[in-house]
């Protein structure tokens, strides 16, 4: 929840979710 994964999730889910990233406030974050 603190580290940006450099990916947005406005229209599609986080592809980086495979790396443990999750969507928060239209941006993918890790931890």
Swiss-Prot record:
Keywords: Disulfide bond, Plant defense
GO process annotations (BP): defense response
Cross-link (Cyclopeptide (Gly-Asn)): 1-31
Pfam family, one: Cyclotide
Domain of life: Eukaryota
Database matches in InterPro entries: Cyclotide, Cyclotide_bracelet_CS, Cyclotide_sf
Family named by the database record: Belongs to the cyclotide family. Bracelet subfamily.
Protein purpose: Probably participates in a plant defense mechanism.
Annotated protein name in UniProt: Cyclotide mden-M
Organism for this UniProt entry: Melicytus dentatus (Tree violet)
